Amino acid sequence: LDNNFDFHYFSGETGSRGMKHYRYDILYKGMPVENEQVIVHTKNNNIFSINGTYSKNIKITNNILISKSQARGKALNHIGAQLYKWELPSEEELLKQITGNPDDTYFPEGEKVILRKEKEYYIAYKFDIYAHKPLRRADIFVDAASGEIIETIDKIYDADVSATAETKYSGTRT
């Protein structure tokens, strides 16, 4: 990898056989590359193996032409909620209690990332938007040049599927 790449440690664990596994995000020109990481496996403090998903040839196809604030506006318009979690003081207070961080907030600060979409790499703003009404949470990726929504990854799913089950006391139920 060339000098534009760097690694950022984000977690580690010890396996049942005493091997340690260290996970690193891949940074390109200081920005995290979404969905790409490297895992370093060690045994007795020696590197045993390395695996992961990354591209050696990142060619960014856009420039930064809009501000983070403009991108946030595009992301919020895309979600189109009536009410967001950060607008509710009780939700903000609960978050601070759960995390133990008095500065934590649901407000989507956003960050610049590199996102691969259909073999192209884009600089994008990534926002974690948590809507209260209607309930929805998603990572929204906004093209840093055009302001278009490149990708939406929902974090809350629901399903309503009919099924049949054989119950212990009530026989077959649908």
Predicted regions and their residues:
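Zymogen propeptides/activation segments of proteases
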Residues: 1-174
